[in-house]
């Protein structure tokens, strides 16, 4: 049977790998989207390198939404989204193993299972529903319509759309940036919220701040990862207390998600793109120095 440390490592690795698999599918998809746009641009009337201001060109542009949506929501992308959603259930099962290894017991209330179902539906909607129209399809259509109305340079129009749809060596495309945030945050928040629901049922007092460090790890997580904390101290962070050097003013820290408080801290933790989590543990695992810190803060006798 895998140890607590081994399970934590597996769980933490998945918090990075699972969203990344979906993001890789988006990178592959961007080429198809750009090819479709290039094909559309070839149908426009152009004179001296500039797009002709005409009803015919506007009519050509007007069909782009439906065409782009078909290309964007292609079979490969839909399969990747479906696979991503199924990983929420697998992550919950791994969390069950981690909790049992850390506490020696496990109780999964029905609310935890129901929550995972809700989290999956929300993620799927964000990845294939109306937000995609708002974040990607309509902005591209807007770029093309403006190019026609203003008689813009075809070369400059193609360059602008390429940056928007495919990105470059300095910036991600608009859609990749969006999918990165949605996939990273939805998976990590679901992971933490599931654990929080189970922990509440177990009435646990101590938690291990789990996860590794990556290039984008911020001060808040960097100072806490690998340590154990009493739940009262964790909740104090949500209230803007005990932040140490990470307090950027007003009881806030860099990357903090709006709406973080003593209740939501268990789900939001370090903030946007945070891949860390709080795992319930037995007090037997907690060091004397960590208990002393909690005692000095007035959280335990």
Where are these regions (language model features)?
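N-terminal leader/targeting and assembly helices and adjacent pre-domain segments
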Residues: 1-172, 263, 279-301
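Acidic, glycine-rich two-metal-ion catalytic cores of nucleic acid-processing enzymes
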Residues: 170-286
């Amino acid at each position: 049977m895998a140890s607590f440390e081994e399970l934590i490592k597996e769980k933490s690795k998945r918090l990075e790998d699972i969203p990344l698999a979906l993001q890789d599918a988006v990178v592959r998809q961007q080429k198809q989207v750009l090819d479709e746009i290039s094909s559309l641009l070839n149908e426009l009337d152009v004179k001296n390198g500039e797009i002709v201001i005409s009803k015919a060109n506007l009519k050509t542009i007007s069909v782009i939404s439906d065409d782009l949506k078909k290309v964007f929501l292609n079979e490969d992308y839909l399969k990747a989204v479906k696979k991503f959603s199924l990983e929420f259930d697998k992550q919950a099962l791994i969390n069950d193993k981690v909790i049992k290894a850390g506490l020696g017991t496990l109780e999964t209330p029905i609310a935890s299972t129901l929550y995972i179902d809700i989290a999956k539906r929300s993620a799927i909607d964000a990845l294939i529903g109306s937000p995609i129209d708002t974040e990607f399809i309509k902005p591209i259509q807007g770029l093309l319509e403006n190019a026609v109305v203003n008689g813009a340079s075809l070369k400059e129009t193609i360059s602008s759309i390429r940056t928007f749809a495919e990105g470059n060596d300095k910036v991600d495309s608009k859609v990749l940036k969006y999918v990165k945030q949605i996939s990273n945050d939805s998976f990590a928040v679901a992971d933490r919220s599931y654990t929080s629901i189970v922990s509440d049922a177990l009435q646990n007092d101590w938690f291990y701040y789990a996860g590794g460090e990556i290039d984008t790890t911020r001060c808040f997580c960097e100072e806490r990862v690998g340590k154990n904390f009493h739940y009262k101290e964790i909740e104090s962070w949500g209230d803007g207390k005990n932040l140490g050097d990470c307090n950027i003013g007003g009881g806030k820290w860099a990357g903090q998600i709006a709406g973080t408080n003593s209740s939501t801290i268990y789900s939001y933790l370090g903030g946007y793109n945070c891949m860390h989590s709080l795992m319930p543990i037995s007090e037997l695992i907690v060091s004397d120095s960590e208990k002393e810190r909690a005692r000095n803060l007035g959280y335990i006798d």
